[in-house]
């Protein structure tokens, strides 16, 4: 159900917004979830992916493979990961494009801007959890299973 009357649910308009998005908008759209370890450490679910992050592929042909992000190709909505390549007919090797939603970030490349973003997102999430008051940890759930 739509809660905000100013947000469209038109398929045509959403597709147009997606495919004509600027590079800065694509950065946010091309976010990847964090691994469970990082999620518990930072209290943040996902982050915009960037070069030099270490990721693990969780869907598709290359499932289970890990590597460092070599390039974020925003125009094609894909990322290139080291050692994920294929050989062309003429013998040259090229990177295979992987969608950012099909990977989990296992190690973040942190600088001051990224640290401030993590703190800001964690602060907002903590405020929402406090307001809601129904946040369960994985330990709470496992205690109830037995």
UniProtKB/Swiss-Prot annotation:
Residues 9-18 have a biased composition (Basic residues). CDD domains: KOW_RPL26. It comes from the Eukaryota. Disulfide bonds: none annotated. Keywords: Ribonucleoprotein, Ribosomal protein. Pfam families: KOW (PF00467), Ribosomal_L26 (PF16906). GO terms for molecular function: mRNA binding; structural constituent of ribosome. Residues 1-26, 121-146 are annotated as: Disordered. GO terms for cellular component: cytosol; cytosolic large ribosomal subunit; cytosolic ribosome; nucleolus; nucleus; plant-type vacuole. InterPro entries: KOW, Rib_uL2_dom2, Ribosomal_uL24_CS, Ribosomal_uL24_euk/arc, Ribosomal_uL24_KOW, Translation_prot_SH3-like_sf. One of its GO terms (biological process) is translation. Residues 121-138 have a biased composition (Basic and acidic residues). Belongs to the universal ribosomal protein uL24 family. PANTHER family: 60S RIBOSOMAL PROTEIN L26 FAMILY MEMBER (PTHR11143). This is Large ribosomal subunit protein uL24z. It comes from Arabidopsis thaliana (Mouse-ear cress).
């Amino acid at each position: 159900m739509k809660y905000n009357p100013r947000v469209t649910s038109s398929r045509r308009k959403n597709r147009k917004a997606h495919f004509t998005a600027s590079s800065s908008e694509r950065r946010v759209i091309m976010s990847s979830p964090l691994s469970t370890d990082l999620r518990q450490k930072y209290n943040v679910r996902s982050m915009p992916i960037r070069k030099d992050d270490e990721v693990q592929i969780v869907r598709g042909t290359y499932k289970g493979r890990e590597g460092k992000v070599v390039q974020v190709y925003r125009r094609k909505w894909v990322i290139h990961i080291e050692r994920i390549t294929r050989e062309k007919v003429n013998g040259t090797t090229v990177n295979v494009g992987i969608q950012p939603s099909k990977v989990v970030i296992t190690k973040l490349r942190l600088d001051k801007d990224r640290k401030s973003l993590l703190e800001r997102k964690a602060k907002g999430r903590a405020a929402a959890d406090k307001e809601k008051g129904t946040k369960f940890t994985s330990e709470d759930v496992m205690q109830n299973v037995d």
